[in-house]
């Protein structure tokens, strides 16, 4: 209790002392968008572009909700089939291939990331899985477990034992029959998804530190960050549902910096929380709207991007913020809308090049490549 109180006091103090609290205006960063970026085959449609990432060669990976869905709902499981698709394009936007077609863990796409070795990681919210592909497109690691693909009925209640059925001559003093058997015993309770450890419940994103440790944003229902070693062995997790520091309400996006600090987009609490590599709370940034996507650039001077992208019923302004890692806002760009250079719920950002970023949009069903001009911000 005392530790929680100390964390809260520290967070409040950092907020009032931080440059965020003092900033009254944010410069607008000019930018351009490349028209008709992705060249799709005639029979292929993109769908909701929930994930976008690039590799060291400039190839573009897009994780989409493109297929038709088939939902079967059990009493404690929901099974959704055939909605995730993963496409690869070259650096010019030319279509290269589809990866993982028909994969058992592809159900409801959420994000895609490319690690420093050019492995491709997809996060599937529907299957509760994180899946790693090597650059050739082979599955080399799976984390989490897909819920059962069949209906899971509730165990029937036990039948009450009926009264004994008597036969023969009652006057003889003994029953002529035996008591009827009881019905079948109830099945043991089944655990739902999201048990502690490496079982996820609607995970959303993944990141790595320099040692290769894996951080999974776990996500909608577990309200935690789970840490694994480079081989996928579970180490620890932190977080719970709530509004205090180190608590979350939809862990929607995650990134790490060169020092191994972990930045978590706490979407419904409308803040970014920062932790050290072991999950100890460090800071929070609270004036960048609802962070649907965060991305940290590589290189010696790292920048943090965060998208403020609520849905159509609560759109906000739809802008993207460019920040220092300490939370100082350097500028913003974009607004909600359907035209080029406007955004329809930016769900993921790729920022391998700090001034050339890719954004995947849900409601506009597209990916935009943006060229920023921060030196012209005003």
Q: For each predicted feature, which ranges?
A:
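Positively charged n-region of N-terminal signal peptides that target proteins for export
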Residues: 1-5
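Bacterial N-terminal signal peptides
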Residues: 6-19
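Eukaryotic scaffold repeat domains enriched in small/polar residues
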Residues: 21-378
């Amino acid at each position: 209790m005392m530790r929680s109180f100390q964390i809260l006091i520290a967070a409040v103090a950092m907020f009032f002392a931080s440059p965020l609290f003092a900033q009254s205006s944010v410069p607008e960063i000019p930018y351009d968008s490349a028209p008709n970026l992705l060249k799709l085959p005639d029979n292929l449609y993109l769908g909701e572009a929930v994930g976008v990432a690039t590799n060291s060669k400039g190839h573009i990976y897009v994780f989409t909700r493109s297929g038709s869905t088939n939902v079967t709902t059990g009493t404690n499981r929901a099974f959704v089939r055939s909605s995730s698709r993963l496409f690869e394009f070259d650096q010019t936007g030319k279509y290269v291939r589809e990866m993982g077609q028909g994969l058992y863990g592809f159900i409801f796409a959420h994000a895609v990331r490319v690690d420093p070795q050019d492995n491709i990681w997809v996060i599937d919210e529907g299957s509760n899985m994180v899946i790693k592909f090597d650059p050739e497109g082979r599955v080399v690691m799976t984390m989490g477990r897909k819920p059962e693909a069949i209906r899971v009925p509730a165990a029937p209640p036990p039948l009450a034992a009926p009264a004994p059925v008597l036969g023969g001559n009652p006057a003889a003093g003994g029953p002529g029959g035996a008591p009827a058997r009881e019905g079948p015993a109830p099945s043991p309770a089944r655990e739902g998804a999201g048990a502690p450890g490496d079982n996820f419940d609607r995970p959303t994103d993944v990141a790595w530190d320099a040692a290769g440790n894996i951080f999974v944003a776990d996500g909608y229902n577990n309200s935690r960050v789970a840490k694994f070693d480079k081989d996928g062995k579970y180490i620890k997790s932190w977080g719970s549902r709530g509004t205090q520091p180190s608590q979350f309400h939809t862990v929607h996006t995650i990134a790490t910096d060169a020092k191994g600090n972990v930045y978590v987009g706490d979407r419904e609490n409308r803040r970014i929380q920062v932790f050290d590599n072991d999950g100890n709370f460090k800071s929070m940034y609270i004036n960048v709207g609802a962070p649907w996507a965060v991305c940290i650039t590589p290189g010696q001077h790292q920048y943090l991007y965060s998208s403020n992208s609520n849905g159509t019923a609560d759109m906000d302004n739809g802008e993207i913020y460019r920040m220092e890692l300490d939370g100082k806002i350097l500028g913003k760009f974009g607004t909600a809308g359907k035209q080029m250079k406007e955004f329809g719920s930016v769900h993921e950002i790729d920022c391998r090049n700090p001034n050339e970023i890719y954004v995947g949009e849900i409601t506009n069903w597209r990916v935009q490549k943006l060229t920023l001009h921060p030196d012209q911000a005003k």
